[in-house]
Swiss-Prot record:
Species the sequence originates in: Conus tessulatus
Molecular function in Gene Ontology: toxin activity
Keywords from the named record: Disulfide bond, Secreted, Signal, Toxin
UniProt keyword annotation of Transcription present: no
Name listed for the protein in its UniProt record: Conotoxin Ts-03
Signal peptide: 1-19
Similarity comment: Belongs to the conotoxin T superfamily.
């Protein structure tokens, strides 16, 4: 009887592990490029704020 909870937990984990191994879909690629664009934009604004915080005209 002690093994029954462990067995049930393992059965619940098996389907979730299989979903991780699935190839990316078109939606996943679009979402990844959206995050890349957002990251690139934030980095550009961060670099501008660091270049000369007092004088914004020099950037």
């Amino acid at each position: 009887m002690r093994c029954l909870p462990v067995f049930i937990i393992l059965l619940l984990l098996i389907p979730s592990a299989a979903s991780v191994a699935q190839p990316k879909t078109k939606d996943d690629v679009a979402l990844a490029s959206f995050y890349d664009n957002a990251k690139r934009t934030l980095q550009r604004h961060w670099a501008k704020s660091l270049c000369c915080p007092e004088d914004a005209w020099c950037c």
